[in-house]
Amino acid sequence: VREMGGLHKFSGWSGPILTDSGGFQVFSLASLRKIKEEGVYFQSHVDGRHIFMGPEESMRIQSNLGSTIAMAFDECVENPAKYEYAKKSCERTVRWLERCKAEMQRLNSLPGTVNPHQLLFGINQGCTFDELRIENMKQISALDLDGYAIGGLAVGEPKEDMYRIISAVEPYAPADKIRYLMLSLIHISEPTR
């Protein structure tokens, strides 16, 4: 895709394109992954290969795709989760975000970058714990990114919790930046018979 000029040229689409970091995809491979400070080690469900993905790798992949918006690499925690694990995950996600920002700035400054104006969005996490969610949004907002997403929703929690979290966190998202609500429609749609 990089050799073809990035996603915009490859697809013939001149509008905005957002690429995900791989965090949700890693979440979906729960039985095949190991999360560490440096990133995530997982096993391919296709051929059994061992693969590593960290913040820098995620940013390099998204930079090569040349999307308009790149999402920061984060850990999406399945609900319900224990408070202590959710807290540690939030802290790690902020550290990963700092690494994403540094790598994105480096990549955007390189000659030959597909999209040197690529935007970076941070992702709010904290499971169903309002205080973790609010603190996490304050921490990621302090990094002065291009936009902010509320992520880690519709991953097992009741809809009432999802709506409560959105209401609790939204006031802490910077009003002068783009806001993005990330939802897995697979988990919130009602089954039809």
Predicted region positions:
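Alpha-helix N-cap and loop-to-helix initiation/capping positions
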Residues: 50, 81-92, 128-135, 157-161, ...
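Active-site-proximal loop/turn and secondary-structure-junction residues that shape catalytic pockets
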Residues: 23-25, 75-78, 126-128, 154, ...
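Charged helix-capping and loop-helix junction motifs
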Residues: 3, 137, 162-167
